[in-house]
Structure formats: structure tokens, C-alpha cells
A protein has these predicted regions:
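Short helix-coil boundary/hinge micro-motifs
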Residues: 1-164
Length: 164
């Protein structure tokens, strides 16, 4: 299963594609289950105070993995089209996490369609283009003037009394 010496190149590529397709379907199912457990708060009877704690402590997920999956699951419960897009490989977990906070009833179909089959970076650009943040105004601030009496060099001697 983990040794590929006797596997032809074309066969290896086909196996990889099939595994990725299965992984996409499993990820969509996993998100659906996480979302339902989260909604029912079934982590509480398991001795966990949050879905995040349950994922990390009971399911042995990394913190990053737990965070991404929970947020994606919550977005997918609100907008079930996400499950379909993840299952067919049109949208990845990172993309769901970028899009999730931006989705609403009015824009979710259009945004999900535009994000389909795009990289995380391209989805970030899509989000930025649709909801640009105002530029941070340039600020100039006056720095406090150095005080000869307060300026301490080596040995705590004020600059005016120090020898060069």
C-alpha cells in the first residue's frame, strides 16, 4: 500500500487522482458531521467545553486543523452548497475559510461560483476586490525630544556629564 516500486507511472497518477476525489468526499462528510455535532453541542457530554476542545483533545486534530474544519463546517451549515463544492473538489478547506466570513444570503451563490477551482490566494484577491478595506491614513506623529537629563548612556551617567 505504501510501496510503489512495481506501480507504473500512469497507474500511480490515476490512483492519486482517485484518492484525492475520495478525500474531497470524505472532507465534505467530515464537515457535515462536525457541523451537526457542533450544532447539537454533543461535545458537552463528552466532557469538552467547546467543539474546538473536542476536536483537539478527543479527535486528536491539530489546533489549526480543528479551527479550519469547525469554521468551514459552520459556513457549510449556513450555505449547504459548500458541501457539494468541497465534495466535488471545486472548493478546498482554505478557500471555505477565506470565504466564510464574507458569505451572506444575497452573495453566497455568486461568491462560491467565482471562487470555484481557485487557489487560496486567488480567493483572497476575489474577497479583497469585492470588499476593499479603506487605506490606512498616513500619520505623522511628533516624537518626544530627547532629554539630556533623562538620556542614560553606559553607567547611567547623563549625556551632558559623560566624557567622549
Amino acid at each position: 500500500m505504501y510501496n510503489f516500486e512495481d506501480v507504473a507511472d500512469d497507474s500511480l497518477i490515476e490512483r492519486l487522482k482517485a484518492l484525492v476525489a475520495k478525500d474531497n468526499v470524505l472532507l465534505a462528510q467530515l464537515l457535515a458531521h462536525i457541523g451537526e455535532v457542533d450544532a447539537r453541542k454533543l461535545y458537552l457530554p463528552q466532557g469538552c467545553s467547546s467543539m474546538f476542545t473536542y476536536c483537539v483533545e478527543r479527535l486528536i486534530c491539530s489546533e489549526g486543523e480543528a479551527y479550519k474544519r469547525i469554521h468551514a463546517a459552520r459556513a457549510a451549515r449556513k450555505f449547504p452548497l459548500i458541501f457539494e463544492l468541497v465534495a466535488n473538489g471545486a472548493l478546498h478547506l482554505s478557500g471555505v475559510n477565506v470565504l466564510g466570513p464574507e458569505l451572506n444570503e444575497e452573495n453566497h451563490r455568486e461568491l462560491l461560483e467565482h471562487a470555484s477551482r481557485k487557489s487560496k490566494r486567488a480567493i483572497e484577491e476575489l474577497v479583497r476586490a469585492r470588499a476593499p478595506k479603506p487605506d490606512v491614513p498616513a500619520q505623522i506623529r511628533k516624537l518626544p525630544s530627547p532629554s539630556a537629563q533623562m538620556s542614560v548612556a553606559t553607567h547611567g551617567v547623563p549625556c551632558t556629564e559623560r566624557e567622549n
